[in-house]
């Protein structure tokens, strides 16, 4: 919805799932300001329940954490013209990163992280053990899952393939070894004769229809 209201301003705003034909499908457009306020309220409500930091480095950047929520809140507050709350959200991110930097520095004295202006921990642009530049770019955009990353779509490299296992497990055909379309988990109320224990519900990996191609024998 954040993308939609920035592109089109007022858009239909629905917060409940459509489970049958009794739902109203012709919904009038909601005002930009009302949707923005609703998004902010939802994020503020769940922020304190979000994970602060995972122990796994990849999960820490590929899953939404409190830092990720604060970053999104900062952007939302910018569009709302609420400068104080925007600054507060960014300050929380910086404070969190400073604490992480101190922890890393204790364990890895030769870390490539540096304090910019003695305040903001960032990745040094100098490659370790050499005077070559480009280390920061490679860490952020090449290797990925970097210290500076708040949230990114992580893809796993190996054996010549690049994929996102989580996305494949939930939204792709699990019969395939690589990411491809063809899987969707059915909501239990859609039909009583459709199995819900398996993620694979399409008859064919190349059939994009939903109900018609669901595996009713599951």
Regions inferred by a protein language model and the residue ranges of each:
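Elongated scaffold/linker segments in the mid-to-C-terminal portions of large proteins
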Residues: 33, 99-218
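Aromatic-anchored glycine-rich loop motif in surface-exposed flexible loops
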Residues: 1-61, 85
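Short, charge-rich amphipathic alpha-helical segments embedded
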Residues: 6, 95-102
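Solenoid-repeat scaffolds in large eukaryotic assemblies
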Residues: 86-89, 93
């Amino acid at each position: 919805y954040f993308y939609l209201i920035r592109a089109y301003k007022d858009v239909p705003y629905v917060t409940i799932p459509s489970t049958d034909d009794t739902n109203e499908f012709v919904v009038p457009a909601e005002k930009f300001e009302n949707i923005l306020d609703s998004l902010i309220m939802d994020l503020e409500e769940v922020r304190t329940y979000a994970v602060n930091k995972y122990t796994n480095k990849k999960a820490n950047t590929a899953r939404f954490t409190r830092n990720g929520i604060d970053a999104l809140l900062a952007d939302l507050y910018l569009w709302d013209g609420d400068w104080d709350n925007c600054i507060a959200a960014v300050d929380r991110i910086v404070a969190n990163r400073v604490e992480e930097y101190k922890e890393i520095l204790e364990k890895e004295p030769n870390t490539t992280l540096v304090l910019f202006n003695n305040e903001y921990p960032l990745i040094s642009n100098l490659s370790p053990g050499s005077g070559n530049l480009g280390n920061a770019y490679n860490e952020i955009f090449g290797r990925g899952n970097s210290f500076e990353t708040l949230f990114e779509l992580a893809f796993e490299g190996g054996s010549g393939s690049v994929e996102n296992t989580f996305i494949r497990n939930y939204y792709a055909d699990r019969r395939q070894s690589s990411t491809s379309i063809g899987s969707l988990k059915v909501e239990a109320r859609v039909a009583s004769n459709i199995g819900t224990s398996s993620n694979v519900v399409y008859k064919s990996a190349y059939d994009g229809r939903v109900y018609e191609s669901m595996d009713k024998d599951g």
